Amino acid sequence: SISLRIASEPLLSQSYKMAGDVEKAKQILQAGIYQITIELLNLLLPYMELCEKDDGLFEEICRRTLAITKIFHLETLHPSVLLTVYFSIAHNFYRRGNKEKTLDMLEKYTELALSGIYPLRLHGDSFFTLLDDWLEENLPLGNQLPKEEAVIRKNITEALTDTGLFA
């Protein structure tokens, strides 16, 4: 059984606000929103796979997942997560026999992988204006990803060429 999750960020943020540190209060909320957005996507992808036999639900999960990535500008905010989303959706469309949508997602994956997303680093944007400092202060690797960039690029390529998932 899973316990009900209650985010601690609103309470912590309120404490900082009451102490007069509004910037810290904002930073805590931004970090929480960022983390929950990534966590939500990490929940939606396996749920999508489990619901692949229900056409309507499967399509709705895909639609909502892609909407979240667009709303939060993951193409620039966290492209490595967006690559995972595109790949997962493509694979699920492939398993369902939908060649057109498979190719559409693989095209998006390839375009993003070949775009100017490198070097891949965790960072904020115009919405997450206080995230950069939070990442540096709270993550052991700061804004660095846990893998070397050469390994990441190789994995991105191998996802299409060596996995056999689309064979």
List where the protein language model places each region.
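Alpha-helical protein-protein interaction modules
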Residues: L43-L45, D54-F166
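Short coil loop/turn residues that delineate tetratricopeptide repeat
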Residues: I2-L4, A31, I38-E39, I71-L74, ...
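Structural signature of tandem alpha-helical TPR/SEL1-like repeats
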Residues: V22-K24
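Residue-level signature for tetratricopeptide repeat
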Residues: Q14-S15, M48-L50, N92
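Conserved structural position within tetratricopeptide repeats
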Residues: I33-Y34, E111
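Generic helix N-cap/helix-start motif at coil->alpha-helix transitions
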Residues: I2-L11, Q35-P46, H78-Y86
